[in-house]
Amino acid sequence: MTREDLPDSTPEESKLPMEFQSPLLEKRRRPVVHPSAPAPLPKDYAFTFFDPNDPACQEILLDPQTSVPELFAIIRQWVPQVQHKIDIIGSEILKRGCHVNDRDGLTDMTLLHYACKAGAHGVGDPAAAVRLTNQLLLLGADITLRSRWTNMNALHYAAYFDVPELLRTLLKASKPKVLNSTCSDFNHGTAMHIAASNLCLGAVKCLLEHGANPSARNSKSQVPADVVPDPMDMGLDKADSAMIAKELKQLLLDAVPLTCNLPKITLPNYDNIPGNLMLASLGLKLGDRILLDAEKAGTLRFCGTTEFASGQWVGVELDEPDGKNDGSVGGIRYFICPPKQGIFAPVSKISKAPDQPPSSVTSTPRTPRVDFSRVTGKGRKEKKATHKKSLSVGSLDREGLKIEIGDQVLVAGQKQGIVRFYGKTDFAPGYWFGIELEKPTGKHDGSVFGVRYFTCSAKNGVFAPPSRVQRMGGPKDPQTDNNDMKKVHQVTMTQPKRNFTKVRTPKEIASENSMSRILFCCWFPWLLRAEMKS
């Protein structure tokens, strides 16, 4: 679609053909809208886009017969070859007698709009964009002009494409007029809203330095901090974006002035308080049943500081799949639960669930979990040896599962590997897992500062604290030849945690009386089959 602003043109201009304007033409006093045209390309050209670095394309660019609409068509091509030469192409347009505020008929954008867009990092070149912008401002370019399609002015474009260099140039030329101007396409938000919603950290910092209002509200009554994307909604492949979102939101929240006369230093800060002390002050502990917002029931799995936001947060495994994650946010795992059953919330949002009285309604009883280690025929000595081994190796506090040497694990919710070491080290205090990764994405071969803790290929070794390690399956080297018992162990490991009263051993049940022995012989095979099928 084309748009011609005929009333804006003078009678002398209407006599000239729009396809060509002489470079000797005197500058017009009023801007016009140029009709759209296709981008010119050399004959037998191998590419579909215009490359100003190509000699044949340079000849077209410098040819006076190349019209302003054709040059606008070249600028519209969103490729680095064109955008890096925005200052040269813009100068050629001005040489052809174009008014500094003339518009492209296809996009309704001015040269200043295109210059701000061309400053985008990656595709454009901020230095070239600043050169053209300075030239346009000296010629009297109007910063307040908006594209009729997007309702964005030059400052909005610079904020949208995260070009702090251009923002400084524009605000220096016309700071009061456009600093807090709004845009209808972004819910009547300011340039700060536009930058915040697109995670443009550099643009937000620049706007704050020049006095932009961090408390300005859009048509939805949102301040810029409210439109920052939620890090918890980002997948594992967007860990960097999650970190930017966290920093950006905190920056905007800190910039909002306090609504009371108390200095910020008097506000409480719980970031340095351990999570267990925070829970103890509330009469809670990990594993307790809690209510979130007095509505959603779940189990408390985590309490402490996080990477996605400041302050103390609790991680809850909901009973129903009404959550947002599986216990990990931005590639960092805080606890383990099924997908869509994990959720994070401030400590103030949870309360202890009331104790449920035992129900008198008769229903089909659930199969109680049996401690199969007591029916495998192992003696007391073997049990003690196994228990001692478990204590000598690290354990992950997740449903009471032990992580042993040789187990397949997941490090930081991302990298798979096998546990080769657990214990204290010389390079850091506390207990550490030494893990041989499946891929060479580690840091060493099992030795740190000349001390060898385990042996693996170069770049396959990594150390991690127990909080960053989760078990993926049974031990790497099976401890028993009984395949059935191994399968039962793996099945019961993945079941939800249940709390029962003390389960009596088969021996205790059988020793009560003859009737108990008969019931036991009938009940135990059925129980074993049911547990294995589940």
UniProtKB/Swiss-Prot annotation:
Domain notes: Microtubule association is inhibited by the ANK repeats and the Golgi localization region (GoLD).
Source organism of this protein record: Xenopus laevis
Keyword Cytoplasm: yes
Domain of life of the native organism: Eukaryota
Region Disordered, residue ranges: 1-33, 349-391
Protein's cellular compartments: Cytoplasm; Golgi apparatus, Golgi stack
Region span, GoLD: 475-534
Note: The N-terminal half is dispensable for proper Golgi targeting, whereas the GoLD region is required.
Skewed-composition ranges (Low complexity): 358-367
Gene3D superfamilies per UniProt: Ankyrin repeat-containing domain, CAP Gly-rich-like domain
Record's compositionally biased regions (Basic residues): 377-390
Protein name in the entry: CAP-Gly domain-containing linker protein 3
Job of this protein: Functions as a cytoplasmic linker protein. Involved in TGN-endosome dynamics.
GO biological process: cytoplasmic microtubule organization
GO molecular function: microtubule plus-end binding
Regions of compositional bias (Basic and acidic residues) in chain numbering: 1-16
InterPro entries attached to this UniProt entry: Ankyrin_rpt, Ankyrin_rpt-contain_sf, CAP-Gly_dom_sf, CAP-Gly_domain
Keywords recorded for this protein, A-Z: ANK repeat, Cytoplasm, Golgi apparatus, Repeat
Any one Pfam family match given in the protein's UniProt record, by short name: CAP_GLY
Record flagged with keyword Repeat: yes
Segments annotated as ANK repeats: 107-148, 150-173, 187-299
Annotated Gene Ontology cellular component terms: cell cortex; Golgi stack; microtubule plus-end; nucleus
Domain CAP-Gly: residue ranges: 304-346, 423-465
Quaternary state and interactors: Homodimer.
